[in-house]
């Protein structure tokens, strides 16, 4: 049986929110089979649980925000991406503020946290959502066009293309493909950091956003170059971060996908719109398990390696 996974023990982290600049503590705890991933706002007078789902996403401006019972958690995508990359099905996430800490701006710190706690196989089959027919969402035309698509695929593959007219981005790859069967999430994707431009940061801070952002947790560019003294972690770090974000956004479905995801200039809003479009067509997907893990698509049966 290809089994569900949780943590062997709890693990903690402290950081600041990218947009709020607020100090926040995270405690990641094991959860029973079929729990799913549950954020718990423990700072509130009455703690509120927010179970991840496509419908729980209530805001997609600059990040993915989930809500329930009047409580919110912002910027969940990097932690969700790490859970997707390591195949974590069940997890309690206690959080002391309304934004997940940005840490180093990638998913690598979350991968380290999860792996340091240890990953435990559980006595219940892992449930996948297998895409049976193509589903697509589009916006704009010509130079403003953007789209995202899910297609049938016996595995999990993502391809993404960006289109930034900037010297630092032009000199790197603007398209990348990652297949879970042949690549390593921890090595190939997890270390890609979020990025932004100085002109946008100034505007966001004037609006009370990006208050926790800086050169230690983002790639920052002026009109011509990358300002971080250490440079890039990957030659194509910009577009790889978009893959990282997409994996996190898609994992908000609540189950891992068996599908090929492809996108052009997509973002948090379009990724969530794609999930809702999939769920709106019940003939476009099915829920499957694998009694014999040898029959499962390559890449899901082995625990992800550290880099």
Curated annotation (Swiss-Prot):
Molecular-function GO terms, alphabetical: metal ion binding; UDP-3-O-acyl-N-acetylglucosamine deacetylase activity
A GO cellular component annotation in the UniProt record: membrane
Superkingdom of source: Bacteria
Enzyme class, spelled out: hydrolase
InterPro entries found in the cross-reference section: Ribosomal_Su5_D2-typ_SF, UDP-acyl_GlcNac_deAcase, UDP-acyl_GlcNac_deAcase_C, UDP-acyl_N-AcGlcN_deAcase_N
Residues given in the record as Zn(2+) binding sites: 78, 241, 245
The keyword Lipid metabolism is assigned to this record: yes
Annotated metabolic or biological route of this protein: Glycolipid biosynthesis; lipid IV(A) biosynthesis; lipid IV(A) from (3R)-3-hydroxytetradecanoyl-[acyl-carrier-protein] and UDP-N-acetyl-alpha-D-glucosamine: step 2/6
E.C. designation(s): 3.5.1.108
Catalyzed reactions per annotation: a UDP-3-O-[(3R)-3-hydroxyacyl]-N-acetyl-alpha-D-glucosamine + H2O = a UDP-3-O-[(3R)-3-hydroxyacyl]-alpha-D-glucosamine + acetate
Annotated active site: 268
Keywords in alphabetical order: Hydrolase, Lipid A biosynthesis, Lipid biosynthesis, Lipid metabolism, Metal-binding, Zinc
Example GO BP: lipid A biosynthetic process
Job of this protein: Catalyzes the hydrolysis of UDP-3-O-myristoyl-N-acetylglucosamine to form UDP-3-O-myristoylglucosamine and acetate, the committed step in lipid A biosynthesis.
Family indicated by similarity: Belongs to the LpxC family.
Protein name, entry field: UDP-3-O-acyl-N-acetylglucosamine deacetylase
């Amino acid at each position: 049986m290809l089994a569900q996974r949780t943590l062997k023990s709890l693990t903690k982290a402290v950081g600041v929110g990218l947009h709020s600049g607020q100090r926040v503590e995270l405690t990641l705890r094991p959860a029973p089979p079929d729990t799913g991933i549950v954020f718990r706002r423990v700072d509130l007078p009455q703690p509120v649980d927010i179970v991840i789902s496509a419908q729980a996403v209530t805001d997609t401006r600059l990040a993915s925000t989930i809500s329930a019972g009047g409580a919110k958690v912002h910027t969940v995508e990097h932690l969700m991406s790490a859970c997707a990359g390591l195949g974590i099905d069940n997890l309690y996430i206690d959080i002391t503020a309304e934004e997940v800490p940005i840490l180093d701006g990638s998913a690598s710190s979350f991968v380290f946290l999860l792996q340091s706690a240890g990953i435990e196989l559980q006595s219940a089959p892992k449930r996948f959502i297998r895409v049976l027919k193509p589903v697509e969402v589009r916006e704009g035309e010509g130079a403003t066009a953007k789209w995202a698509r899910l297609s049938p695929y016996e595995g999990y593959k993502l391809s993404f293309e960006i289109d930034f007219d900037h010297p630092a981005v032009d000199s790197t790859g603007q398209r990348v493909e990652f297949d879970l069967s042949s690549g390593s999430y921890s090595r190939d994707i997890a270390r890609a950091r979020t990025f932004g431009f100085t002109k946008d940061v100034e505007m966001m801070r004037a609006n009370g956003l990006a208050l926790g952002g800086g050169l230690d947790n983002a790639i920052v560019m002026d009109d011509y170059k990358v300002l971080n003294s250490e440079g890039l972690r990957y030659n194509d770090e910009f577009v790889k971060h978009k893959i990282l974000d997409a994996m996190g956004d898609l994992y908000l479905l609540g189950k891992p996908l068996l599908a090929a995801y492809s996108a052009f200039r997509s973002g948090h809003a379009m990724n969530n719109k794609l999930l809702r479009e999939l769920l709106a067509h019940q003939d476009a997907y099915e829920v499957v398990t694998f009694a014999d893990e040898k029959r499962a698509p390559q890449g899901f049966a082995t625990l992800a390696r550290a880099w």
